[in-house]
UniProtKB/Swiss-Prot annotation:
Region of interest (Necessary to mediate nuclear localization), ranges: 1-299
Name the record gives this protein: F-box protein MET30
Pathway(s) annotated for this protein in UniProt: Protein modification; protein ubiquitination
Segments for region (Interaction with SKP1/CBF3D): 180-225
Species this protein is from: Saccharomyces cerevisiae (strain ATCC 204508 / S288c) (Baker's yeast)
Molecular function terms, GO-annotated: identical protein binding; molecular sensor activity; ubiquitin binding; ubiquitin-like ligase-substrate adaptor activity
Location of the protein in the cell: Cytoplasm; Nucleus
Pfam families found in the cross-reference section: F-box-like, WD40
Region (Important for mediating homomultimerization): 180-277
Stored InterPro entries: F-box-like_dom_sf, F-box_dom, G-protein_beta_WD-40_rep, SCF_subunit_WD-repeat, WD40/YVTN_repeat-like_dom_sf, WD40_repeat_CS, WD40_repeat_dom_sf, WD40_rpt
Nucleus is among the record's keywords: yes
Gene responsible for this protein: MET30
Feature: compositional bias, Basic and acidic residues: 1-19
GO biological process assignments: cysteine biosynthetic process; G1/S transition of mitotic cell cycle; methionine biosynthetic process; protein polyubiquitination; protein ubiquitination; regulation of mitotic cell cycle; regulation of sulfur amino acid metabolic process; regulation of transcription by RNA polymerase II
High-level lineage: Eukaryota, Fungi, Dikarya, Ascomycota, Saccharomycotina
Amino acid sequence: MRRERQRMMSFEDKDKDDLDNSNSNNSSEMTDTAMMPPLKRLLITGSSDDLAQGSSGKKKMTMATRSPSSSPDLATNDSGTRVQPLPEYNFTKFCYRHNPDIQFSPTHTACYKQDLKRTQEINANIAKLPLQEQSDIHHIISKYSNSNDKIRKLILDGILSTSCFPQLSYISSLVTHMIKIDFISILPQELSLKILSYLDCQSLCNATRVCRKWQKLADDDRVWYHMCEQHIDRKCPNCGWGLPLLHMKRARIQQNSTGSSSNADIQTQTTRPWKVIYRERFKVESNWRKGHCRIQEFKGHMDGVLTLQFNYRLLFTGSYDSTIGIWDLFTGKLIRRLSGHSDGVKTLYFDDRKLITGSLDKTIRVWNYITGECISTYRGHSDSVLSVDSYQKVIVSGSADKTVKVWHVESRTCYTLRGHTEWVNCVKLHPKSFSCFSCSDDTTIRMWDIRTNSCLKVFRGHVGQVQKIIPLTIKDVENLATDNTSDGSSPQDDPTMTDGADESDTPSNEQETVLDENIPYPTHLLSCGLDNTIKLWDVKTGKCIRTQFGHVEGVWDIAADNFRIISGSHDGSIKVWDLQSGKCMHTFNGRRLQRETQHTQTQSLGDKVAPIACVCIGDSECFSGDEFGCVKMYKFDLND
């Protein structure tokens, strides 16, 4: 036994000499001895604690592990075994897999325990071998461990070249697990956050389930701020999702906080984590896509509802019964009814200060809707006022008298734009470009310059009366679906325009006008008509680039935001369309038309449904009004 111990000790000294020679010959190259983990260094030991008794009664050699030591000189452990000094713990002397700072970190404890268990299994298997084979294995491992990178690669090449398929398969199964690197945890935080910012929402949520370190990084506010910036009020080009602004809900929360909470509560409401903001909007968008909503009805008008608009707390409706209803969206109750028009209220517009209504009685009224007082009345149209729009001190109106009027409130002047040959059903201002759009029963759409009161373009393509138009500025034009063959035509000259009789009448210039590129005109125009279609137009060229079919009867009204189009039809249905693709996402059927008899019983008129006369859209809701006087709210924010 003494002879055996001396032989082993001389063998260990020889390994140390080989290591010293290797270090001196490769001083410019970092040795892999320093790359070995202190806890996984394979040592040859002969102590009673590390040697096991075999069935033959002889001592067996084992692979032992030891704890880190900070002593710079050769030391002796409790069993008398000589050990080598350990390098400092840093990334310049350790690779990722053998770095103690990583091994002992909380996020890698489980991985370290698995490796330690694996080492113990190897020790146990070696201990079962004869003493000579144990010595040979330890010599091979020691030689490999003390070699530099170049020698290690040569040894591996030789081993792999002499290995058969069973051994190669075994190596492959081990390496697949061992080469995995948790780069997120070891990189600087800024780089880790940058990498995570490229993930989509689903992948980012999955990342929080990996470990605590990943959860902390994936939940960082900076990552979710980037997600919100990519998706809110725009469509992400990578995943195709866009999230609503929910500005009306935010205004509603601030309004409630101002009335019932302290400044600290308001501050709490306005400083929510970006992940919470994203989650809230993601749920709303998901409900829009799946068609999940809660329906609420507003009943109070005695006749059909012709127009409606809303803000974060109030709903305004105009009806054939010549009244304007103001509803509380929280309670669903009618809080005020404005009377003054002598005929049906066909159109309305409101802002924070005033309410403007147009009626079949040929007048336009301006109201203080808070007090219910009529501030002023505008008379000038010779037939029913069908549409009004306003911006600051300018009001535009369209009428059944075939004209568009521009009212300048401050200068108290009115200009009449002539060109349509039938009723003007809708007018829309675009303040940034000082332009106005109008559509008519003559199947045309006209674009006007309200500074010069001249007609810039005429859009032709509908084969039925055009009922509604919406100017749009679409940024993501590349992903906008268009028809390969458009039946629309370029703007054409119209010889039917005549001068007005009064001095303020302004004849339109029908000569085709090239739009000034320096003026921010809307990029597209959306329209609907009684030809059962919805059309999308390119404002610059004046051509129809897409036609959407789906309704079986005329489309009376449309509304749109950055993601969706809502349409209401005479067939009694409300359809939700994707703005970019033009595909119909959902169809909501209107209520069946019923009338009460004198005995308070309801009599159904067969399968007939109430035609939808008007619609409007918000971030998390849309509204419809039908010809039986019922208003419906489709609420997609189910948490409210």
